[in-house]
Amino acid sequence: PLAVAKEYPEVHILTGEGILFWNRGMINAWEAAAKYKDYDAYLWLNDDTNLNKGALETLVKTADEAGWKKIIVGSCSKIDNPSIITYGGRNAKKHLLRPSLNKAIECSFFNGNIVLIPQFVYKVLGTNDPVFHHSLGDFDYGLRGVKKNIQSLIAPGILGECDRHEALPSWCNPQ
């Protein structure tokens, strides 16, 4: 946080006690951002995910083409093998989908590593559901979108790198 604050003094850094985990941490950050300003969109970006060059531009272009009314999902590949998709949009059978190289494709739900949530979507769905401590809040958000007729689109190309976490550690959803 100190390096970020030094390099980007305009960034608002939230501190915590390490008990929120991914989903509740996302809720905390999202609520703080929404109180600060009515942004055009909110970006979910996992701290273990590295963005590829042009990723943000691709997300924004895809949102623009979708009229800023759909959830935009970025796909991630394995760090040492860009041909292996590790996170991104999924179909109804829970399988990861390979992004198109040149157009957005629809998905049923998604991993929350790289996701752009337009203001329109936020106004309809709100933030993540706090019932989830760590994992599954991202899947739930996409499925809630389906129930409200909000599509999720996978942006073209591979937008980031993040190695796969093969099994959920026991701390993912503490009791």
Report residues per predicted region.
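Acidic donor-binding segment of Leloir-type glycosyltransferases
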Residues: 1-15
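Active-site-adjacent helix/loop segment of glycosyltransferases
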Residues: 143, 147-175
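Short beta-strand-to-loop element that shapes/binds the nucleotide-sugar donor at the catalytic cleft/hinge
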Residues: 72-85
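Glycine-rich, basic loop-to-helix element that forms the pyrophosphate-binding segment
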Residues: 16-35
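A recurrent flexible, glycine/aromatic-enriched loop bordering the glycosyltransferase active site
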Residues: 96-117
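Short beta-strand-to-loop acidic/aromatic patch adjacent to the donor-nucleotide binding site
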Residues: 38-50
